[in-house]
Amino acid sequence: VRDEGDAVIRCTAGINCPAQAIEKLKHFVSRKAFDIEGLGGKQIELFFADGALPIKEPVDIFTLEFRDQNSFTKLKDRHGFGKKSAENLFDAIEKKKTIEFSRFLFSLGIRHVGENVSKLLARHFIKWSKFIPSISLAQNRESQEYFDLVSIDGIGITVVNSLLSAFEIGKERNSIEKLVGHLD
């Protein structure tokens, strides 16, 4: 699909497309997002293809240690990992369960929601528990919440529509809600 004014055609499969899912995970762990030490692009690709301990969506990162404990194939026994490497990765993941709201929003990789927009939204809503009800109510594009969102300085209809698409009830919304349940 090509959006009006765009020079590129975009795949609309979202997280159902393996290539997009991998790139979204790489963005999620990038330096300006969650910045999880020891979990970069190369490791994301390996875990994505892993049959025993796959990382297919962001929440899988935060359940990795639990799944490893219940797996016959331990991470420490795998090529490229050892006991210390596995422990370091689990510790690095644990440390990232607390994150600034703006970085969390940025990490989601929502189209048109970059660092600056994430900071504007975080400044306006302060925290997730204020943000998500407003987004849910704004799904009705005639609601006061929709108009409030559009009127945030630096946020326009394009950004709001991207946010609403990402947070519509469905697979992506469920993925985000599961992720939030594993964060502090």
Where do the protein language model's features map onto the residues?
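Accessory alpha-helical DNA-binding modules that contact the DNA backbone or grooves
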Residues: 1-184
